[in-house]
UniProtKB/Swiss-Prot annotation:
Domain of life: Bacteria
Protein family membership: Belongs to the RNA polymerase alpha chain family.
Comment, domains: The N-terminal domain is essential for RNAP assembly and basal transcription, whereas the C-terminal domain is involved in interaction with transcriptional regulators and with upstream promoter elements.
UniProt keyword annotation of Membrane present: no
Record gene name: rpoA
Name recorded for this polypeptide: DNA-directed RNA polymerase subunit alpha
InterPro entries: DNA-dir_RNA_pol_insert, DNA-dir_RNA_pol_RpoA/D/Rpb3, DNA-dir_RpoA, RBP11-like, RNAP_asu_C, RNApol_insert_sf
UniProtKB keywords: DNA-directed RNA polymerase, Nucleotidyltransferase, Transcription, Transferase
Source species of the chain: Campylobacter concisus (strain 13826)
GO annotation, biological process: DNA-templated transcription
Catalytic activity: RNA(n) + a ribonucleoside 5'-triphosphate = RNA(n+1) + diphosphate
Length: 338
């Protein structure tokens, strides 16, 4: 049953799973009902619009005057050459924001992204097809590679490059796909809390986790404008006054520790139900538990250290009384149901 509170539940868990080099799942929970989508939707939009990438913004081809021209000895006309060029994903090695890269090829040759790698740029999709030229043809062209965010149409790029270059629509974002799913998650017998599961796919210019970090940074920077009227730091998480939010892991059942049957049965007989109860005990208190042997003691100590609450170390400090009170409340509720 949902209780009356004075602040929203503070999410405490974040999980990052690498599916492949360019795909990752990022999960955060638990959120109050409605909060998950409120956060997930703008983050998804920012992933597309704020992630920095590289794109060709202009091309100059020897013997070609405009994008609807054709070139003798090349299978594709210039329009299709440009379409293929925009599909190739460049990454500048120098750290600069703009470079002009020159290329020269003699036929017969099928040109792919791998042929465009050099000391200035890395092609992250080397198998991408560009053009085919016959044995009598020679293809000489230069490309302007620019660093940027989002999408910029060729009409606006026209003003930033020299007249002899054909302006290109620039798709800077390295994020190919960003989707999220809102799932329900159980918190203290309440199934109405929520979990955000992001699936992020990039083209290889940046990794999906790096793209997500950049997205969060962009959101914090945009929110910083409110510092002028609010006496809070919006660039950092605001601490929750909710004990359940702070002690999410500690209020989980000792069953979640996956202890051996001997160790679990000993805790069960001692009516130790929550991980937080172990976190509040020192080694001597554990030794006093009936039938708790040396092996079980060492197992519990190892597991508690693994989850960040080593036995005998005062990690909780000023939060101990608050945790004791919460555990007492939960145990009372459990007894009332029995």
């Amino acid at each position: 049953m949902r209780k009356i509170t004075t602040s929203a539940y503070m999410p405490t868990e974040i999980e990052v799973k690498s599916v492949s080099e360019n795909v990752a799942n990022i999960t955060a929970y638990p959120f109050e009902a409605g909060y998950a989508v409120t956060l997930a939707h703008p983050l998804r939009r920012l992933l597309y619009t704020s992630t920095v990438g590289f794109a060709p913004i202009g091309v100059k081809i020897k013997g070609v005057s405009h994008e609807f021209d054709s070139m003798r000895g090349m299978l594709e006309d210039v329009a299709f050459f440009i379409i293929n060029l925009k599909k190739i994903r460049f990454k500048l090695k120098s750290g600069s924001e703009r470079e002009v890269i020159e290329y020269s090829f003699k036929g017969p040759k099928e040109i792919t992204g791998a042929d465009l790698n050099n000391d200035l740029v890395e092609i992250v999709n080397p198998d991408a097809y560009l053009a085919t030229i016959n044995e009598d043809a020679e293809l000489n062209f230069s490309v302007i590679i620019q660093k940027g965010i989002g999408y910029v149409p060729s009409e606006e790029i026209r003003e930033e490059i020299e007249d002899e270059y054909i302006a290109l629509d620039a798709f800077f974002t390295p994020v190919k796909k960003a989707v999220y799913e809102i799932q329900n998650v159980l918190v203290e017998d309440d199934p109405d809390y929520e979990k955000i599961v992001f699936t992020i796919t990039t083209d290889g210019q940046v990794g999906p986790v790096e793209a997500f970090k950049n997205c969060l940074e962009a959101m914090y920077q945009q929110m910083s404008v409110f510092k002028g009227i609010l006496d809070i730091d919006v660039s950092a998480p605001v601490a929750s006054s909710s004990a359940s939010g702070e002690f999410s892991k500690l209020l989980s059942s000792v069953e979640d520790l996956n202890l051996s049957a001997r160790s679990f049965n000993c805790l069960d007989k001692a009516e130790i139900r929550f991980i937080g109860e172990l976190a509040l005990m020192d080694e001597n208190e554990l030794k006093e538990l009936k039938n708790l042997g040396k092996k079980s003691l060492e197992e519990i100590k190892a597991v508690m250290e693994e989850i960040g609450y080593p036995v005998g170390v005062d990690v909780l400090k000023d939060s101990k009384e608050q945790l004791r009170k919460k555990i007492t409340e939960l145990k009372s509720q459990m007894s009332a149901k029995e």
